[in-house]
């Protein structure tokens, strides 16, 4: 008996409809639920950032291996966000699909973005504290701590223009990853689909504002307890977080 198999992925028009429906759901979500889910997303991205810095602590790796494999390590964060249904500020940029179709208002959109941004920040800071208390930075002869400071110092050395445009490029790739995730019909589809866009933006050195909610405080904390190079203070932190 012949069986009509479903296509490998959703068609672009179906993805658009799915993105609009997701935007409506996010815009009408109660504050408490949205904030908690955003905290989870911030924590998940921080987990990806932690995986990335642990990998980078191996000084024997070539530059190319660090960028590409490190990018794949960072993918953990967005995989967890998409599969677990958490609320990520950068991915929620696709809510403009629902706004442009008139299904949500500007006030709903902005309220959601502000709520999720704050929740992401809180979640990332919680992971910073947990990583410190767990002593993860002491791994590999404390090379992980040096890696954490090095990543943060590299980000704070950029000028404002470079940060801004790297932030735009990063979110293009993040939205493409989320779009591909919407296209997938299974968990495997979603995971495989998002790997390359996320690994690519990490390898290219683009700037992800939620990831920096982890990288910069973690690097600053490591410097404060005596590791690595100088990491600039609160003004630089705010400059990096404002890049979106």
For the regions a protein language model found, what residue spans apply to each?
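Alpha-helical transmembrane segments and their helix-helix packing motifs
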Residues: 1-244
